[in-house]
Amino acid sequence: MGKSWKTAGKVEKAQQKGQIFTKLAREIAVAAKAGGPDPNANARLRMAIDAAKKVSCPNDTIERAIKKGAGLLDDGKVIEELTYEGYGPHGVGVIVECQTDNKHRTAPDMRHAFKSHDGNMGESGSVAWMFERVGLIEGTKEGSFDPDEEAIEAGANEVFADEGTYEFFTAADDLDAVREALTSRGWKVTKGELSYKAKNITELSDEQRKDVEEFLNYLDDMDDTHRVHATI
């Protein structure tokens, strides 16, 4: 990074924080547009605001994003939700969900990302068949409990533990009902969204996995990327 590595590191961290704020603001705007500007009546917006506050996103940034999504602030830019899919290195199926104010920028950027990592961006549906559309809920709960029993009682299909947080998978149509059931059972829900779950996992060697993870991290760091899904 050169002789100014300390300064450069600070600049890089600031840039990364700015990128995170931009992505969070887009999700807030999209959520407000889809379900209205009242977080008490819009669970997606409420969770997006909570996520933004968790990383100290400025309040004025949050308020502007809500107004923009609700149509109360016109800056001449419209945020669209777009999905790109294709094959990454070693034949791994990849779906990238984007939020962008310029699809003419995002599409070529995505195409370049796939190509530069020995992948190939395909047409709509080219790898979607490798995934199941599901509801994904993440949350935590105090005290002792049986995760499997919690999942059954709430109507979820599966539950997985991930460093103190639990992921519940549901049928896509059951997302809201399961989220409400978990909340009523004392869960603090930190994420509730439609997602993609790989039907089958692509077998990889350790070296191949490094290639794929490098590609997925690259995608995740792109300005317009919202979520990345892969068959690993």
Curated annotation (Swiss-Prot):
GO terms for molecular function: DNA binding. SUPFAM superfamilies: YebC-like (SSF75625). It holds the Pfam family TACO1_YebC_N. Keywords: Cytoplasm, DNA-binding, Transcription, Transcription regulation. It is found in: Cytoplasm. GO terms for cellular component: cytoplasm. One of its GO terms (biological process) is regulation of DNA-templated transcription. It comes from the Bacteria. Belongs to the TACO1 family. NCBIfam families: PRK00110.1, PRK12378.1, YebC/PmpR family DNA-binding transcriptional regulator. This is Probable transcriptional regulatory protein Bd1964. It comes from Bdellovibrio bacteriovorus (strain ATCC 15356 / DSM 50701 / NCIMB 9529 / HD100). The lineage of its organism: Bacteria, Pseudomonadati, Bdellovibrionota, Bdellovibrionia, Bdellovibrionales.
